[in-house]
């Protein structure tokens, strides 16, 4: 189907959370309505409570409300907080960066510490070149992803705010 609409290489993932070795329905993610609400994946929180406390028009932001979500495996909660921590770490510790945006994309069925994409956008101070900072930024992103469980620990211990 994709070849009808693009000449680009397309990779399709279907039912990646299913367990093909299962001998009964417990290994498959099946719903009657087609929504996650029947499987306990729903959040009981509105969309106004941003992880960083801000509603930022004309800037990248997530509509995900982090409060009330599972701090162990809800990527909307974890990646929102993780993105903020990465951005703070980079801006505080890498000379020459004024601002930073971090975007992390999950993939169903993959471990949380292995996102489909982790993308950064930096706004540099005058005279600073991307090649002066890119390796340092990449190292900080990698370090946070390797130790992503600290996000859960900090939320559970009340050290990290979710709004």
Predicted regions span which residues?
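A domain-level signal for the structural core that forms small-molecule/cofactor-binding pockets
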Residues: 1-163
